[in-house]
Regions:
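Switch/connector loops and helix/strand junctions flanking conserved nucleotide-binding motifs
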Residues: 41-43, 75-76, 100-104, 129-134, ...
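Canonical P-loop GTPase G-domain recognition
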Residues: 99-156
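Extended helical scaffolds that flank P-loop GTPase cores
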Residues: 118, 145, 149-203
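Conserved G1/Walker A P-loop phosphate-binding module
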Residues: 1-47, 57-64, 86
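Helical mechanochemical/support elements of P-loop NTPase systems and associated helical scaffolds
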Residues: 13-17, 29-32, 44, 48-51, ...
Length: 203
């Protein structure tokens, strides 16, 4: 996608078996890129989902997550985006395969969505390299806290669920937790509401 490696790596579930690493340089910055398995969510139901979640939660949290989503399948891909927002990670979205969206005659106001979710969105075409330079320029801006789009938001799940999330967050703060402090307590609360057994076992 960026480092020029010719490994069999993709954005789709099951294509990447484990993490691949590459190095990319731009504008005086050196990026260590870790390509995690393709997944549509951060649940614990598949090996890919569990691997990605553990990497984000238990390993050293990345400075920036580049969330590569398929421009032709937005609804399915944006579910993962909402979960990353719940995790409160720094993120830039690569709206990949943007040419397929245009070929279908569709238009997408990605700049308005970016402002709504507080996260930069950059159209890309990985097979041609279109948008890659701009993508990493936005990564630099987010890292340097200079991107005007970035803001902290919560996905509102409705009054009933929000009350449950708030109650669980208060309970988490009252007990000793094995989870790193860098992990969003809101994210943990949502996972506990989902009866996520792996999270339950770690709190």
């Amino acid at each position: 996608f960026a480092s020029g490696a010719h490994e069999h790596v993709g954005n789709y579930s099951g294509v990447t078996v484990d993490a691949k690493e590459g190095v990319f340089k731009q504008n005086g910055y050196t990026f260590r890129i870790v390509d995690l398995p393709g997944t549509y969510s951060l649940s614990a139901y598949t090996p890919e989902e569990l691997y990605v979640r553990k990497h984000l939660n238990e390993n050293q949290q990345p400075d920036i997550v580049i969330n590569v989503i398929d421009a032709s399948n937005l609804e399915r891909n944006l579910y993962l985006t909402t979960q990353l927002i719940d995790m409160d990670v720094q993120m830039v979205i690569a709206l990949n395969m943007y040419d397929e969206l245009e070929k279908a005659g569709n238009k997408f106001d990605y700049e308005s969505l970016a402002r709504m979710i507080g996260c930069p969105i950059v159209p890309t075409i990985s097979k041609t390299g279109f948008g890659i330079e701009e993508l990493f320029n936005r990564v630099i801006k987010v890292y340097e806290e200079e991107d005007p789009v970035v803001r902290h938001i919560h996905i509102n799940y409705g009054d009933i669920l929000e009350k449950g999330i708030a109650n669980i967050k208060r309970s988490i703060h009252k007990v000793d937790s094995n989870m790193p402090k860098s992990i969003s307590r809101r994210y943990l609360s949502i996972k506990l509401l989902e009866n996520d057994q792996e999270i339950e076992s770690q709190i």
